[in-house]
Amino acid sequence: MTHLAGRVAAGVVLALTIGVTTGCAPSIDTLVRDSLADAVEGAQDVLWEYRDQIVSDPEAAIAGLDFIGDARVGADDGNHSYTLLALDESEDSVTLTLAVDGGAQTGGGLGYQQSNAVTCIDLVFPTAAAEIRVEGAACGDVADVAGYEQVVPFGDLQVREVVTVADYPPPVCQCHSGGDCDCPGG
């Protein structure tokens, strides 16, 4: 009876360990949404430095950015971080509609999972304010064309909806001995 009790106890411990371990791990859907949120904020971050160019001449600015594929001229080859679906200019803003993708994998062996998804956003560059606003946009058939497993609505993501100059402070000025120094105060 002791031998049987030991086996039962070991089985219970194993079941509890597996239950606790898998119960604490984030789901694949959570990981995909986190990946998409990171990608949206990454788009805000990388486009901030081109904000003035995008506001003044958006077509030329976008043409010079190799990390944005332009789906308006044909199918994107998938070698870009972001896919431009539309570009709209008005008197008070420029709006880029982008498809942003993300993905995740979890587990290993029999528990391995992999998923990818896309969300579509409008990045609005107001002409009168140094900011970038992000809003949800319709993806159309981009998900079917590119083979994404799911389209995640922008509203399901937790991201900054507005970035301003306060989000991008200037780098700290550092001088090195023996070299020229452009820092204030020399």
Please tell me what each predicted stretch does.
Residues 1-12:
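Bacterial N-terminal signal peptides that target proteins for export
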Residues 36-69:
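N-terminal alpha-helical signal peptides/signal-anchor transmembrane segments
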Residues 182-184:
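N-terminal sensory and localization modules of signal-transduction and trafficking proteins
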